[in-house]
Amino acid sequence: MMKNLILSACLAVAAVAAECAVACTGMYAGRKVSEDGTVLLGRTVDTAPWTSSHMYVVEPRHENEPGRVFRSWKNDFRWNLPATTWKFVSTPRLRSIGGGRMDSACVNEKGVAITGTVTGRTNEKAQKADPFVRGSGTGEESLPGLLAACCATARECVDLLGRVIAEKGHTGPEIYMFGDRDEAWYVEVYTGHEWAAVRMPEDKVACWGNQFMIRSFDPSSPDTLCSPGLVSMPEKAGFLVKGADGLPDLYRTYAPELTDYSNYRTWFGHRTFAPETAGEYATDRPMELFYVPSHKVGYREMFELMRTRYEGTDRNPEENGLPGVRTIGTTKQATSHVLSIDASLPERFRCTLWASLGNCEHTVFLPMNAAITACDEAYATDQTEGEFRYDARIASMAFRRLAALAEKDRRWYGRGVRDFWHAREDTYLAEYPGLLKTLDAAKLTEWTLAAQRKDLADARRIFDDLAWYITANNRIEGDGSGATNEPPAPFKP
């Protein structure tokens, strides 16, 4: 009886967390400033640990099957699907978690990459003027998968997003990114029906926390798209703000005041990519969305930025006794990803999804190409809605438990785990480009399945080894023994 009560309470917490604890960090590098000439779209998916359970799945193509309807897991949102929908690889949340599917990151057979969302913040005036449509609207819980199934270009993603929001409304303040061979788009959704999109420059980079970033916005520019009421709605309601150039300032119109929670991440990303233009940090200083980096940006740098806890600075929580500091490398990461778009490849091979499960500080980024036909069963296993439970056979839970143990003591436990996965990623970064050049979907699938199985086996083994290391070295606090000895050496897998 008590066990059931505890489980019910935990599930209730999980349900609340699924609704309100989503808070991510986004990143971007244009093809002219990335190390390998690809477009890079990155994002951490940050939520409560109880909901840190995602899958890797391959959704099949459906050919000439009219009459199908896309249904949200979260609310009453419905959308009629075209007769043919595209195959795509994605990282959805387990159905048992509740709160919607949240495909999170998708790459499809048409060479389109989609990530969503980074949660933004909308001010009270905007929310009152155009409330979010939570009962039947679309949002991060449904839109990424719908777009991946229906869209053959990034521009089609923006257009369909606009049509869906106009007809159904949106559930919350969110930021999306879409990319293809020719262009990439950054989209901010401010209210139930108002949104703006800007074409992302090929020669710049970006990093931002949970805040809207678009300042001066010209609706007539060929590099922008927006909802019909983006400017007229706030103008009529009396809260439109214009900049010195006479154009709408979307941040000042739709967003509340800046906070350290989000703005420090934005500044730290700028300092990482372009230290000479980052300037000194100030809570109330808006940062530029796009800027020229001081160097070429690659996968490794994005991976490590997603892991950072501001080591070596006065804001590192562990070094400075500041447990409340919001780092980019938070323990609440459910999954993280970097999507790459290689314009030189045929469309079905063009996009690769590099993803990790659990807190990426102590797990591994693995590449999955859009052309693969399967993921290992442990990565693709779902749970029935409303029946969320711990099951270490599910890959995300195996990785999450390892990360949870490693982060209890980053000096003695975590460093060795992090170094192990770092070496594994180096192997993938060296091997994968050559494999991709074969343009062989069967070989890519075989390689991916083998890599997934090896990573999972190692995660389970390292967890067992680390648990024994902790036990053998008497590092479990509060055991009553009074032992104070330090281990002879940090844990090494």
What is the meaning of each model-derived region?
Residues 144-150:
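Short, well-ordered beta-strand elements within core beta-sheets of diverse protein domains
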Residues 1-9:
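Bacterial N-terminal signal peptides that target proteins for export
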Residues 266-322, 326-331, 416-418, 424-435:
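Accessory, solvent-exposed terminal regions and/or long lumenal/extracellular loops of proteins
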Residues 24-140, 160-289:
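A contiguous strand-loop segment
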Residues 156-166, 302-306:
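Short, well-structured alpha-helical segments that form the helix of a local strand-helix-strand
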Residues 16-23:
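Sec/Tat signal peptide C-region and signal peptidase I cleavage site
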Residues 416-493:
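Histidine-centered catalytic/metal-binding microenvironments
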Residues 317-441:
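Substrate-recognition/cap regions that form aromatic- and gly/pro-loop-enriched pockets
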